[in-house]
């Protein structure tokens, strides 16, 4: 509770992604799998369970989990590539501090996704080999 906030007021999480049109789970991935603030897996699961029934199509738990993990792979893969590009091509290493969190999120999502769909096993194996520190190899 913030000082001066009205009694009973609760803090809320909001996501300001701009005008990007994406599946509703994408916003959850952006908020819950942020590279700058690493949430515990249990906290992520609790938020997902609370929001899932309120999504436009109210997907069943398995459909939601599949979408969430595939979107996590897409989003975190993009983040990881941007961090490495900034460091290697522009000499801007500020974002490398967030690569370990991003790689951990990629590895968890890839492992879960490959259990659901064997066609993702090779991708999961490649992601599993990513070093948390981009300078490790």
Tell where the protein language model's regions lie, with residue ranges:
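A structure-centric signal for secondary-structure junctions around beta-strands
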Residues: 8-10, 25
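ATP/Mg2+ or Mg2+-diphosphate-binding catalytic cores
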Residues: 81-137
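All-alpha amphipathic helical-bundle segments outside canonical DNA-binding/catalytic cores
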Residues: 60-72, 97
């Amino acid at each position: 509770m913030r000082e001066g906030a009205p009694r009973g007021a609760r803090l809320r999480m909001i996501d300001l992604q701009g005008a990007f049109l994406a599946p509703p789970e994408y916003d959850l991935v952006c908020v819950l799998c942020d590279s700058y603030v690493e949430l515990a897996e249990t906290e992520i699961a609790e938020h997902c369970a609370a929001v899932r029934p309120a999504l436009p199509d109210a997907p069943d738990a398995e459909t939601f989990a599949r979408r969430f993990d595939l979107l996590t792979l897409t989003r975190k893969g993009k983040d990881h590539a941007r961090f490495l590009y900034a460091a290697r091509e522009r000499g801007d290493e500020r974002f490398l501090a967030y690569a370990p969190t991003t790689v951990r999120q990629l590895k968890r999502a890839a492992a879960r996704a490959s259990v659901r769909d064997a066609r993702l096993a090779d991708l999961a194996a490649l992601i599993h080999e990513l070093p948390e520190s981009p300078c490790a190899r």
